[in-house]
Amino acid sequence: MFRNSYIQQNSDIQAAGGLVPMVVEQSARGERAYDIYSRLLKERVIFLVGPVEDYMANLICAQLLFLEAENPDKDIHLYINSPGGSVTAGMSIYDTMQFIKPNVSTTCIGQACSMGAFLLTAGAPGKRFCLPNSRVMIHQPLGGFQGQASDIEIHAKEILFIRERLNTLMAKHSGRTLEEIERDTNRDNFMSAEAAREYGLIDEVINQRPA
């Protein structure tokens, strides 16, 4: 039911020399095996792992929409471990997170850098978390283009537009002023989990689940 959604993640894990664990469920109908990610999706858990790119973004958006259709009133949990990636791919995930009815809780495991940090901060207010040894990094969008001077100018204007839009949204979700965001994203800005909380990118650093 869910397995095809994780073909890319499974392939990435296998390429790194690992195997995707399988879990077996027993019911009155017999046994059924799931890969671990598909089983967690049944619990409304989505993983955003690795660089943010179009194929991954399409899978994340599809899973968000599917879980909304399953239950529009129950939270979705998005776990993020990403170095960042494509702005347009990331914005498709962001827009879907804001569009659907369920709250999307975000949790950083490992790292949330660049677009990963932006999506972490875009979680539902009060439901944005980091594990204690996570790292968060914010910066301005990167871009490069070769060609005629007129084309370079067009792309430079687009990058400036994207930067302003990202900064505006980051200010909205973090509670910081636009001027602060512009200043603090001028260069790579790495933060500990606690520093990310103080800055407003997340709401809480969690060491373990509540009893």
From Swiss-Prot:
Its EC number is 3.4.21.92. Its main location: cytoplasm. GO terms for biological process: protein quality control for misfolded or incompletely synthesized proteins. The active site is at S114, H139. Keywords: Cytoplasm, Hydrolase, Protease, Serine protease. It catalyses: Hydrolysis of proteins to small peptides in the presence of ATP and magnesium. alpha-casein is the usual test substrate. In the absence of ATP, only oligopeptides shorter than five residues are hydrolyzed (such as succinyl-Leu-Tyr-|-NHMec, and Leu-Tyr-Leu-|-Tyr-Trp, in which cleavage of the -Tyr-|-Leu- and -Tyr-|-Trp bonds also occurs). CDD domains: S14_ClpP_2. One of its GO terms (molecular function) is serine-type endopeptidase activity. InterPro entries: ClpP, ClpP/crotonase-like_dom_sf, ClpP/TepA, ClpP_His_AS, ClpP_Ser_AS. Cleaves peptides in various proteins in a process that requires ATP hydrolysis. Has a chymotrypsin-like activity. Plays a major role in the degradation of misfolded proteins. Fourteen ClpP subunits assemble into 2 heptameric rings which stack back to back to give a disk-like structure with a central cavity, resembling the structure of eukaryotic proteasomes. Belongs to the peptidase S14 family. HAMAP family: ClpP (MF_00444). This is ATP-dependent Clp protease proteolytic subunit. The gene is clpP.
